[in-house]
Structures are given as structure tokens and as C-alpha cells.
UniProtKB/Swiss-Prot annotation:
Keywords: Disulfide bond, EGF-like domain, Extracellular matrix, Glycoprotein, Hyaluronic acid, Immunoglobulin domain, Lectin, Phosphoprotein, Proteoglycan, Repeat, Secreted, Signal, Sushi. This is Brevican core protein. PROSITE patterns: C_TYPE_LECTIN_1, C_TYPE_LECTIN_2, EGF_1, EGF_2, EGF_3, IG_LIKE, IG_MHC, LINK_1. One of its GO terms (molecular function) is carbohydrate binding. Residues 157-252, 257-354 form the Link domain. Transmembrane segments: none annotated. Residues 36-155 form the Ig-like V-type domain. Residues 464-478 have a biased composition (Acidic residues). Disulfide bonds join 57-137, 179-250, 203-224, 277-352, 301-322, 651-662, 656-671, 673-682, 689-700, 717-809, 785-801, 816-859, 845-872. PANTHER family: AGGRECAN/VERSICAN PROTEOGLYCAN (PTHR22804), BREVICAN CORE PROTEIN (PTHR22804:SF41). Residues 1-22 form the signal peptide. Residues 683-811 form the C-type lectin domain. It holds the Pfam family Xlink.
Length: 912
């Protein structure tokens, strides 16, 4: 007996040792674990379609060891998603380094990590139906790791709804009522887009909550291209007339009660079905309730009546015997075009709904084979074929608009033209007086180059491009045919067109004096009482021998007396501030070039260079200096003339109205007003918008509800002398969004360069209000134009430019009328009735004339054009000269466009 017992005992001991050792090791491992990961909350966590969900995950350290953890660095956090037996990585983070999977880009975040090493909660936004599943939170720190998992359920379903009588039968108001009638609500664009990302497809146009009409397409096909051609996505017809008829996309979410199938042996008519449910303390279910139950897992292969007279059944596990190979709520129609509900006397089962205080669990899905459709289904067809897309009016079906925007003629006056300014304010001014002793260059003196200051004139405007050919002429004499009275803008004083005889060159002319306030805006073209700019008097009279006669006379040198300052105490309109785009070193003003004498500098006989289309060069005669004058705040300069006593010693809150800028100065607070406003606090309107336009902070706005593509809308705005609205401040954003509550175009676009967004009116991009995730240009679909979504705080989204939306036009409160007409020059470009402030136009001389002086004029802030300075003189025919030899080492001189020798010998060498 003993020999048998000992081997058995030894076997038992050997079998027990590994088990005990494993238990001991496991216990030690549990005791040595540094932390544990836990996901708080009741499972499953529920989120709503298109919304956001926070999955809480916290790290609990069992035995804190700060020094050890600090040496190990930040923990590694990994979130994974498990669904259908497959695992996918969501994100991995360690410290500030985060890697996000492409499917979750811009949708997930760790809001507390790494600031908090114990809170690694995940925020998942823009929830989609396929976001339902298991989420696992895993943390690794050194050699320790721990994880936890939780189930997430995304509830909410978007579905297309239509009346049984016909396709596309709902107006916008009727669509909202229809969704409410079936226990749902009209879906939002975000919900439809989230459903699309979850795989939803429907080739039927339907209303959404923002009054747009859209439909989602996963597989593009000829009948369902919409506005996206061959790309998948949500097709969008834009905001349409509320009386137009379409289907509607509804959204169902909660099922606060129990939905069950009533299946009596003899089936039921519609009225019998209502009675059947009432006898059981329930009522016949609505379509929205059935969709919510299907979204919760209800699977019944048995068609039943619903409250709207439709017959449907929910399928979670698809089969060929139960509606084909796709899950969803199946609907029975009488006709292949998916219209016609079954006759109310037909017999089917019924879906009933019983209210409860708390949402009840959906009954477990039964085996589809146990709930076969009734024999009555033989006369009913379940349509699964592809239907033809709704044919919209021609303007809504077009290819995307691309390319540049071209100017169009003005056909309507938008209230342009300049208004008469207010009476001039009493303020000191500084006058400049120029004295010119002679206008004839000294031919006998040594040549001195005049100082030329070059400045780029950057200007905007719709000007025609014209290629100009510069002709180098060889003249036998200097041409002094200056445009008489041109500077005074007198249309009755024509310029001389006949060549000046050789015998009529002047030796000297009387002094010429001009007195203008620096920065004073020139009056409009037709005001005779306006101060005149410097004027050049008299044609030359003294005869000088021609080069053929062998000598050239040297008239007395001319002297240009410097500017003299004269202080006066008198009233008069003034403009202050440095000219825009010009440095102080030039010593000249954009608005005061008329202060310069209309003569050439001593020793400089060259014509002014004709500026090109891109830039122009301004020539300031040598020896002329114009000192920068003090800036005098006046109403005409759109600044308050009297200091406002500060209430708190600063500009908070700002006392200025109408978008004025508050400036703190030693004497108090001063308001810098926008164009069109004046007064101490910018509370006085100096200009007003045309009837039908709304004024806000120096601009006028007009909203148009007619739907157009972006390019058509921009062209319509240009017909008024305006552009699609540009937005530069949050206040302007709120004004447009709150006043014109529509899904509308704005002027922002990247039609020229992808990703480089610019305003159509050329103002810089100083403010942005993009929707999260925008701009995205989804699937390279040509989303080059920007819309403002009013129901979402006016945030912006980029969409294809051929959408048809309403739009708002914007123009400046102050504008200029047609430019001054000159007798010998005309303006480039097509004429318009109004021009925005800072618009620059260019004159060109008529054929046969040569241009001198700057040809540009600018629309100023007071609604008046700057004074034209261009001079047009007759062009002399070229005359060949016989070459002569130089003597005594005297150099050749350039006089006009020909060369001549000083004091030539009496016997010049013969020509060739």
C-alpha cells in the first residue's frame, strides 16, 4: 500500500507547485502595478448624430512615485476603436507629440493631456453612425500599462420622407410640418452630412432646416451628378424659394416608449390597425418612431401599418427574402417611381407604440425567417431601382464657374456722385507761393540734372490695357506750346494745336504765382469759383536763330524762387494727413501736386517720362521744395475738430460712433471718423446711402434674395458700382448676419490660386469666421467661393461657385462721380457712374499729342477727384540735322530731343 501511496503523493505535490507559484506571481504583479486606467460613466455612452461626445478616461496611480514618473517622462496614450471584429487606431499621444489617424483627423482631441497626466479623456466630434462601437483607452508609462474599454452608441437617424401621393410635394413650411407630424424634425445640413459620412445615399432632393435643398451621393452616376459632377458628396441646390416643392429629410432620435408589432391572423386594414393599437393601450406608430426603433436595433421582416397610411418594416440584418441586401426601413409603394401608399382597405400587420416614462429597450431582433411578409405583398412592389434626378430650372444646373471676373458697363445709377461738402470750418492754414522768373531753359549754361523722385503709383480701377509706343523724336527747336488754362479745368479754353513759330521763343515771362493750401481737396470740375493752380503765361516771343544759321542764342537764365510761407487766419476746407502710398521724403503730396510750377527745372529740358500701366514716375523740378505742413483736424478731414473730454482717461469705452477710432492725445480724446461721418464723436452724417441701401460704419449694403451663382452675383453688384460684401470686423459680420438672415454669398474666394482667399473688392483679408474644419474643398470639388451660414452664427464655408444663393452687395458710403473731362485727353477704361474711394484712373492724350506730367487722378475721401495734371502738347515732325564738328573740346548738349554744339564755328564741316 505504501509503495502506491508515495508515488501518488509526489504527483500531487508536483502538480500543486506550478499553480501556487503562478498565484504568488500574479499577486505580486497586482501589488506592484503603479496605476490603473478607468473609464467612468454608465455603458453604453450615447452621443447624437453630428454632435460631440466626451469619453472620460482617468489614470489612477496606486502607489505614487513622483521622482520615478518624472524620470520616465510623459505617459503614452493610445485610443483604439473596435467594431465588427476589427480594431482601428484613433490616436497615439506622448507629451506634445500626437498622431491622429486619417479617419479621425480634425474630429478628436485630448483636451486635458498633457497638462494633466491623469486625465486622458477623448473628445469625439461630428459623430457619424459608424462611430458606434467599442473604444479602448490604453496608457503605458515605463514598463507599466493599463487599459479600459467602453461601448459608444451614436443615436439619431436621417431619412427621406415624402407623401404617398406624389414625388416632390412639400413646400418648405409643409416639409417642417410633415416631419413634426410623423414624430421627427427636419434635419440640419450637419446631420445629413454626418449621415453621408456614415454611408447614407439617396438620389432625391429634399429640404433641410436652413431652407437649402440637398441629397447625399456615395456612387456618382449620370442621373445623380448634381453640382459635383463625378465626385461623391452631398449635392446642394442652395437656398431655394420656400414655395418650391421637394421631398424632405427628417431626423429622428429618441424613442421614449415601446414599439411592438401587432400581427393578428387575419391582418388589419388601416382603421382596424388604429383600433387594434388603442385596445392595447397604445396608438399606431409614426414613421419617425419606426426609424428610431430601427436605429436602436429593431429587426422585423413583417410589413405593418403606420399612422400616415404607409406600410413599412425595419431590417437590420439584410436578406434577399426581406427587402434585398441592404439594411434600412423598407417602404411598400404601389408604383415603380416610389409613389402611392397601399390602399387603406388592404390588410397588413401594424406597428404600435406605447408611451412610457423612461425609454424602453428595443425588443431583441427576431429571426427574419420567422416573420415573413404576408401574401398581400404580392400586389405591392418594394422599389430599389435607381430613379432619375429631379430636373431643376436651367440656372440651377450648370457647370462650375471658373476664371477671372471681367468688368461690365454700368446700366443703373446706384446713387453715385459727390455731394456738396459742409461749410468750411474756421482753422489756420499755411499757404505756399511760388515765383517763377523764367520758363525758358538756359541754353548757354552748364547742364544740371534735375532731381527725379520716383514713386510707384499703385492703383485700382477697371482700365483698358493699351500698348503705347514711345517715339524718340529729333526736333530742331524746343517746343513751348503749353496747355493754356488746362490746370484751371476750363473746358472753354482749348489747348494750342498749331506749332509755335521758330521766331516766337520767349526770353522771359512775368512771374507766376500760385497759392493753395497743402492738402486742400480740389473742387469738382464745374465749380468756377475754385482756386486755380499755377498757370504758365504767354507764348515765347523772342526769335532765336536756328542751328542752320550757325549760332544759338543764350537767353537769360531763369531763377526759381523757393516757396514762401504765408500765415493766414481764415476759414477753408482742408484735408490733412500724408498722401497714401507716399513717403515723407518726396516732399510732395498726392492731393497737392498743383503746388508745383508748370515749368521745367533749370537745366532740364527733357519731357517727363510717360508712366506705364503698372507704375508711373513723378518728376519734381530741381530747386523746388514743399515742406510737410502740420496736420490740422477738420470736419472735411473726417476728424472731430474739438477735443472730447475723457471720462476715464482712456478710450474704454470708446465714445466714437459709426465705427470711428478713438485716439488719446494730450489735450483729450479725439475721434478719427470713417469717410462719410463727421463731428466731434463721428455722430454727424455727411453722406447718405441711396434709397434701399442700409448704412453701417462707412459702407452701404443691399441684400438680394434672388438666387444666383457667385459670379453672377458679383456682376450684379458691379452694375451698382459695388461688390459682394467683404467683412473686415466682427461688428460688420454681426450686422450682415443679423440683418440679412439667409444662406448667402460673400465676396471671399480662392478662384485664382487654390487656398489663397481674397475679397472681390480688393480689400485685405483682416478677419475670418470659418466654420470648424473649413475651408476644406472636399474631394477637390472646386469649392472656391465662400458662403455665410446665418443660422450658425454666420460662420463661413467654402462651396462650389455654381451654387445658387442669395447675396449682399456692398459699396462705400462716399464715392466719386464721373471723372473730369479734359479737352485733349480721355480716360482709360469703360465709364461708370460712380467710383469708390481710392479708385485711380489714368488719362491718355489723343492721337497726335504728346503727354507730359502725371496722368493719374484719384477718388479722394471726400468724394471728389484729385486735380488732373496731365498736359498734352502737339507732336512735332522729326527733322534731320546736319552733323557739326566739335571745337575747342566743347561737349555736345542735349536740348529737347536734338543735339547742338555751343558756339559752333562759322565754317561747319559739310554733311555726308
Amino acid at each position: 500500500m505504501a509503495p502506491l501511496f508515495l508515488p501518488l503523493l509526489a504527483t500531487l505535490v508536483l502538480a500543486w507547485i506550478p499553480v501556487a507559484l503562478a498565484d504568488a506571481l500574479e499577486g505580486d504583479s497586482s501589488e506592484d502595478r503603479a496605476f490603473r486606467v478607468r473609464i467612468a460613466g454608465d455603458a453604453p455612452l450615447q452621443g447624437v448624430l453630428g454632435g460631440a461626445l466626451t469619453i472620460p478616461c482617468h489614470v489612477h496611480y496606486l502607489r505614487p512615485s513622483p521622482s520615478r514618473r518624472a524620470a520616465q517622462g510623459s505617459p503614452r496614450v493610445k485610443w483604439t476603436f473596435l467594431s465588427g471584429g476589427r480594431e482601428a487606431e484613433v490616436l497615439v499621444a506622448r507629451g506634445l507629440r500626437v498622431k491622429v489617424s486619417e479617419a479621425y483627423r480634425f474630429r478628436v482631441a485630448l483636451p486635458a493631456y498633457p497638462a494633466s497626466l491623469t486625465d486622458v479623456s477623448l473628445v469625439l466630434s461630428e459623430l457619424r453612425p459608424n462611430d458606434s462601437g467599442i473604444y479602448r483607452c490604453e496608457v503605458q508609462h515605463g514598463i507599466d500599462d493599463s487599459s479600459d474599454a467602453v461601448e459608444v452608441k451614436v443615436k439619431g437617424v436621417v431619412f427621406l420622407y415624402r407623401e404617398g401621393s406624389a414625388r416632390y410635394a412639400f413646400s418648405f413650411a409643409g416639409a417642417q410640418e410633415a416631419c413634426a407630424r410623423i414624430g421627427a424634425r427636419i434635419a440640419t445640413p450637419e446631420q445629413l452630412y454626418a449621415a453621408y459620412l456614415g454611408g447614407y445615399e439617396q438620389c432625391d432632393a429634399g429640404w433641410l432646416s436652413d431652407q437649402t435643398v440637398r441629397y447625399p451621393i456615395q456612387t456618382p452616376r449620370e442621373a445623380c451628378y448634381g453640382d459635383m459632377d463625378g465626385f461623391p458628396g452631398v449635392r446642394n441646390y442652395g437656398v431655394v424659394d420656400p414655395d418650391d416643392l421637394y421631398d424632405v429629410y427628417c431626423y429622428a432620435e429618441e424613442l421614449n416608449g415601446e414599439l411592438f408589432l401587432g400581427a393578428p391572423p387575419d391582418k388589419l386594414t388601416l382603421e382596424e390597425a388604429r383600433t387594434y393599437c388603442q385596445e392595447r393601450g397604445a396608438k399606431i406608430a409614426t414613421t419617425g418612431q419606426l426609424y428610431a426603433a430601427w436605429d436602436g436595433g429593431l429587426d422585423r421582416c413583417s410589413s405593418g401599418w403606420l399612422s400616415d397610411g404607409s406600410v413599412r418594416y425595419p431590417i437590420v440584418t439584410p436578406s434577399q427574402r426581406c427587402g434585398g441586401g441592404l439594411p434600412g426601413v423598407k417602404t411598400l409603394f404601389l408604383f415603380p417611381n416610389q409613389t402611392g401608399f397601399p390602399n387603406k382597405h388592404s390588410r397588413f400587420n401594424v406597428y404600435c407604440f406605447r408611451d412610457s416614462a423612461q425609454p424602453s429597450a428595443i425588443p431583441e431582433a427576431a429571426n427574419p425567417a420567422s416573420h415573413l411578409a404576408s401574401d398581400a405583398l404580392e400586389a405591392i412592389v418594394t422599389v430599389t431601382e435607381t430613379l432619375e434626378e429631379l430636373k431643376l430650372p436651367q440656372e440651377a444646373v450648370e457647370s462650375e464657374s471658373r476664371g477671372a471676373i471681367y468688368s461690365i458697363p454700368i446700366i443703373e445709377d446706384g446713387g453715385g456722385g459727390s455731394s456738396t461738402p459742409e461749410d468750411p470750418a474756421e482753422a489756420p492754414r499755411t499757404l505756399l507761393e511760388f515765383e517763377t522768373q523764367s520758363i525758358v531753359p538756359p541754353l548757354g549754361s552748364s547742364e544740371e540734372e534735375g532731381k527725379v523722385l520716383e514713386q510707384e503709383e499703385k492703383y485700382r480701377g477697371e482700365e483698358e490695357k493699351e500698348e503705347e509706343e514711345e517715339e524718340e523724336e529729333v526736333e530742331d527747336e524746343a517746343l513751348w506750346a503749353w496747355p493754356s488754362e488746362l490746370s484751371s479745368l476750363d473746358p472753354e479754353a482749348p489747348l494750342p494745336t498749331e506749332p509755335v513759330p521758330e521766331e516766337s521763343l520767349t526770353q522771359a515771362s512775368p512771374p507766376v504765382r500760385a497759392a493753395l493750401q497743402p492738402g486742400v481737396s480740389p473742387p469738382p470740375y464745374d465749380e468756377p469759383e475754385a482756386p486755380r493752380p499755377p498757370r504758365v503765361l504767354g507764348p515765347p516771343t523772342k526769335t532765336l536763330p536756328t542751328p542752320r544759321e550757325g549760332n544759338l542764342a543764350s537767353p537769360p537764365p531763369s531763377t526759381l524762387v523757393g516757396a514762401r510761407e504765408i500765415e493766414e487766419e481764415t476759414g477753408g476746407p482742408e484735408l490733412s494727413g500724408a498722401p497714401r502710398g507716399e513717403s515723407e521724403e518726396t516732399g510732395s503730396s498726392e492731393d497737392a501736386p498743383s503746388l508745383l510750377p508748370a515749368t521745367r527745372a533749370p537745366g532740364d529740358t527733357r519731357d517727363l517720362e510717360t508712366p506705364s500701366e503698372e507704375n508711373s514716375r513723378r518728376t519734381v523740378p530741381a530747386g523746388t521744395s514743399v515742406r510737410a505742413q502740420p496736420v490740422l483736424p477738420t470736419d472735411s478731414a473726417s476728424r472731430g475738430g474739438v477735443a472730447v473730454a475723457p471720462s476715464s482717461g482712456d478710450c474704454v469705452p470708446s465714445p466714437c460712433h459709426n465705427g470711428g477710432t478713438c485716439l488719446e492725445e494730450e489735450e483729450g480724446v479725439r475721434c478719427l471718423c470713417l469717410p462719410g461721418y463727421g463731428g466731434d464723436l463721428c455722430d454727424v452724417g455727411l453722406h447718405f446711402c441711396s434709397p434701399g441701401w442700409d448704412a453701417f460704419q462707412g459702407a452701404c449694403y443691399k441684400h438680394f434674395s434672388a438666387r444666383r451663382s457667385w459670379e453672377e452675383a458679383e456682376n450684379k453688384c458691379r452694375m451698382y458700382g459695388a461688390h459682394l460684401a467683404s467683412i473686415s470686423t466682427p461688428e460688420e459680420q454681426d450686422f450682415i448676419n443679423n440683418r440679412y438672415r439667409e444662406y448667402q454669398w460673400i465676396g471671399l474666394n480662392d478662384r485664382t490660386i487654390e487656398g489663397d482667399f481674397l475679397w472681390s473688392d480688393g480689400v485685405p483679408l483682416l478677419y475670418e469666421n470659418w466654420n470648424p474644419g473649413q475651408p476644406d474643398s472636399y474631394f477637390l470639388s472646386g469649392e472656391n467661393c465662400v458662403v455665410m451660414v446665418w443660422h450658425d452664427q454666420g460662420q463661413w464655408s467654402d462651396v462650389p461657385c455654381n451654387y445658387h444663393l442669395s447675396y449682399t452687395c456692398k459699396m462705400g458710403l462716399v464715392s466719386c462721380g464721373p471723372p473730369p473731362e479734359l479737352p485733349l485727353a480721355e480716360v482709360f477704361g469703360r465709364p461708370r457712374l460712380r467710383y469708390e474711394v481710392d479708385t485711380v484712373l489714368r488719362y491718355r492724350c489723343r492721337e497726335g499729342l504728346t503727354q507730359r506730367n502725371l496722368p493719374l487722378i484719384r477718388c479722394q475721401e471726400n468724394g471728389r477727384w484729385g486735380l488732373p495734371q496731365i498736359s498734352c502738347v502737339p507732336r512735332r515732325p522729326a527733322r534731320a540735322l546736319r552733323p557739326v564738328e566739335a571745337q575747342e573740346g566743347r561737349p555736345w548738349r542735349l536740348v529737347g530731343h536734338w543735339k547742338a554744339r555751343l558756339n559752333p564755328s562759322p565754317n561747319p564741316a559739310p554733311g555726308p
